């Protein structure tokens, strides 16, 4: 029971809008349900967004764990892991051929800016950790309490130096010194406690943290401004020497 209906907008047109509205931030999904999309179509759509954004796309791919969605697409829920692997293979092959100019009669354009697009496995995606480490560029998992998060990150680090990522559902308190209060998949906390907590996650080897502001009770722009002014600079100063793993896209 995920307790939500997912993203309101379809991610691909939404990413096109964001690509035209921004200049520097990375754009990503967390994630598109790959077994419910044709991989050739998705490869074309993703490459288009990547080209329009100047190479800023990170493509997070999930297997989809809501059985009720699959009948609408005539897809086999029980084979979603196999379909996922095949989709990744097809997209990688298409982008490689496009980047090398090896598609002649039915040319695939545009090619991704850097020849390929970073693929992030969202959740387990019905795959073994070994397969994910070999075939994907990063792994993102749902948030657990601090000690559990450290253990999960260590398991990934044992098999891969590729980036390990997590979501953190955040309700940022107005009081910067508000204590850390766990909520489902995240926390209610002030900026001071948030900085401390994110520092701990970075020291555990977590390279990227996706802050989900959906549970928040404050204006989103105010929250983003506070994080930008009070949290990110302090976090950068504290974690400058942390070996958090390779970056996905500079």
Map each language-model feature to its residues.
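Active-site-adjacent structural elements that line small-molecule/cofactor binding pockets in enzymes
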Residues: 1-250
């Amino acid at each position: 029971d995920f307790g939500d209906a997912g993203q309101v907008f379809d991610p691909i047109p939404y990413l096109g809008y964001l690509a035209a509205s921004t200049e520097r931030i990375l754009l990503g999904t967390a994630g598109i349900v790959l077994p419910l999309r044709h991989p050739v179509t998705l490869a074309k759509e993703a490459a288009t967004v990547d080209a329009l954004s100047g190479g800023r796309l990170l493509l997070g791919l999930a297997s989809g764990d809501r059985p009720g969605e699959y009948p609408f697409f005539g897809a086999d829920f029980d084979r979603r892991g196999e379909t996922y692997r095949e989709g990744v293979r097809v997209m990688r092959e298409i982008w490689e051929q496009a980047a090398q100019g090896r598609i002649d009669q039915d040319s695939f354009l545009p090619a991704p800016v850097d020849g390929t697009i970073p693929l992030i496995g969202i959740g387990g995606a019905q795959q073994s950790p070994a397969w994910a480490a070999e075939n994907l560029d990063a792994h993102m998992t749902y948030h657990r309490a601090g000690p559990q998060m450290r253990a999960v990150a260590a398991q990934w680090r044992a098999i891969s130096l590729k980036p390990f990522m997590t979501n953190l559902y955040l309700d940022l308190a107005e009081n910067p010194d508000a204590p850390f209060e766990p909520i489902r998949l995240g926390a209610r906390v002030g900026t001071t406690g948030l900085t401390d907590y994110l520092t701990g996650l970075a020291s555990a080897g977590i390279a990227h943290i996706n802050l989900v502001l959906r549970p928040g009770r404050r204006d989103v722009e105010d929250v983003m401004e506070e994080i930008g002014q009070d949290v990110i600079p302090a976090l950068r100063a504290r974690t400058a020497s942390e070996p958090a793993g390779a970056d996905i896209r500079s």
